[in-house]
Amino acid sequence: MRFGRKPAALLLLLSMLLAGCTSGSVDRLYCLPKRSEAHRDLQLAIDAAMGGMEYSAPRSGENLQAVQVRDLDGDGKGEYLLFAKKAGDRPLQILIFRPTADGYALSETIETYGTAFDRVEYANIDGKPGYELIVGRRLSDQVIRAVSVYSFAEGQSALLTTDNYTHFTTCDLDGDGNGELLVFKHGEAAEQTGVAVYYSYRDGIMERSAEVSMSAPTENVKRILVGWLADNRMAVFVASTVEENAIVTDVFSVVDGKFTNLTLSGEAGNGVGMVRNYYVYADDIDNDGVTELPELISMRPLSESESPGDSQYLIRWYALRSDGTREQKLYTYHNYESGWYISIQSDWAQRLTIVQDGTSYGVYLWNADNTESEKLLTVYAFSGQDRETQAVSGNRFLLYEGDTVQYAAELEVAAVRYGVTKDRLIRNFHLIQQDWKTGET
């Protein structure tokens, strides 16, 4: 990938690659669309080269097609890459087709070891025109995997580096505009935490950093996010489970030319527990382009009779700087069960109590000396057949209208004294977005 916006035309071409296929064998599901003479020529070239092979699409990542297109050599024309498998010592095949005056021709086949293609990415790593190909392969039916980086700057493929991995991603941690490879892998012993290794292109070779420790084994990794620090540096946020009920987030970046884990070197206490059995991940919660990390704050119960299991939490979001210090950002109340959250003003954070009653949530604010509380509002989630009527019954007003759920609220008299209005509440109400890669919130 290039670390900016992808050209719209390229995205459109990628989306068309598998369109228009008719029903039939599994292999036919990967056929190219019969939309033009050029595509017919390409299909003929593929059919001629596929003897004894079967399509073998990558198993994970964003690039899941068996046939993909990228401008590998930077000549302005896209090469077609076909991922296939055959019998033999090097069963995994990457067939590369280039346009010619007469149509398309197979220009190169990369043969390699493995049982399946795991993941494929593209990035401009060497700074030359075109994209490098980053291919992850499964080497066995177990967890052993290898990632290789190929350059096509000279026309044909050149292997830049290979390493084993559990997870990998591409990024631009040093801010030079070129991509780098970040690999996460096992430590020396099975019981150890994982390690991260950073590869960058320097003086014609891929330089390998020293191994940097993670906070958990690589098997515990739940989510990897490429984002930004508060001082405008790119970072990679790696969320892993610890002790079965919490998430710890490692934050990797390049500081003063050195690859480092900011979590282990700064003041960041990066562990966060679960909220009602949902993990809370780093996110750009305020849409300012900076990635925020969460920290749970237990709210005071409305009465001493409430059990610990009834406890509600606020989330305090903060951004990291490259020196490991924090920049406090905002507070939210996240209701993962109902799929919504509201932003909370910071001076209320230590005085707020939220009480659940079925699918309604009462919001209470304590006075300055914490001796009395007043109810400010109630948030509702209606999902029955009469949800539209319930959402606007009495003094309720609509916060958000979903396909199957109506979110509504009702303000109490005390809300006026604290500046809570209908418009303000609607602005501060948000739906929790689902991560399309993992299906998690």
Language-model region placement:
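Sec-dependent bacterial lipoprotein signal peptides
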Residues: 1-19
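Beta-propeller-forming repeat regions
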Residues: 21-356, 362-365, 386-402, 406-408, ...
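A short acidic-to-branched-hydrophobic micro-motif
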Residues: 369-386
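A short acidic/glycine-rich loop-to-helix N-cap element
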Residues: 413-424
